[in-house]
Amino acid sequence: MSVFQTGKVQLSSSNPVATTGGDTSTFTQVVFPSAFPDGSSVIVIPFVQTFNGPDTPGLRIADVTTVGFKIRINELHANGKVTSDGTHTTETVGWIASTV
C-alpha cells in the first residue's frame, strides 16, 4: 500500500542557472510533514501553481529521502546552452510525495 503526503513551498531564484550535476548548494530543503517508514522508496512530483513571472520556471529535485527532498527553480537550459539568466520571481510550488 502506498503512502501519500502533499505540501507546497514558495520558491524563487537569485542564482544563475544550475548546470553542474550533483551541486545542490542553491537548492531549498523541504521536510515532509511526517517521515515515511524507514526503508521506503519515495518519489516526489512537483508542479508550479502560479504564473508570477514571464520566464518559464523549470524545477529540479534532488536528494529525495524518507524525511524530505531538495528543490530549486532552474530556468531553461537546453542542448548545452543556458537560455536565461537563472533569476526568477517567487512562485508557489505544490508537491505530492509517495512511497512506491
Where are these regions (language model features)?
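Extracellular receptor-binding modules and their adjoining Ser/Thr/Gly/Asp/Asn-rich linkers
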Residues: 1-40, 47-100
